[in-house]
Amino acid sequence: MAISQAKKNEIIKQYARHEGDTGSTEVQVAVLTADINEINVHMQEHRKDFHSQRGLMKKIGHRRNLLAYLRKTDVQRYRELIKSLGLRR
């Protein structure tokens, strides 16, 4: 259900601000978004999986907090990130 390590490394490489960057806000949000999308697919098939639903809500809340932090600190990076991830339609 969680994303594979190879996919995670690909996402990290795409959104990293410098080589070896795994903890920047952009990378964290991108990895969380991929996780959320995977869990969403699982939840459509398994509607009564309440443990996964709780995990999904926790990940969404964490992503929301990270996006709020990024918006507060650097609006330009925030706008670029939500545009590239397809959030906030």
From Swiss-Prot:
UniProt entry tagged with the keyword rRNA-binding: yes
Keywords, comma-separated and alphabetical: Ribonucleoprotein, Ribosomal protein, RNA-binding, rRNA-binding
GO molecular function: rRNA binding; structural constituent of ribosome
Entry annotated with the keyword Nucleotidyltransferase: no
BP terms from Gene Ontology: translation
GO cellular component: cytosolic small ribosomal subunit
Record PROSITE patterns: RIBOSOMAL_S15
Coiled-coil residues: none
Function: One of the primary rRNA binding proteins, it binds directly to 16S rRNA where it helps nucleate assembly of the platform of the 30S subunit by binding and bridging several RNA helices of the 16S rRNA.
HAMAP family recorded: Ribosomal_uS15_B (MF_01343_B)
Family: Belongs to the universal ribosomal protein uS15 family.
Assembly mode: Part of the 30S ribosomal subunit. Forms a bridge to the 50S subunit in the 70S ribosome, contacting the 23S rRNA.
Protein name according to UniProt: Small ribosomal subunit protein uS15
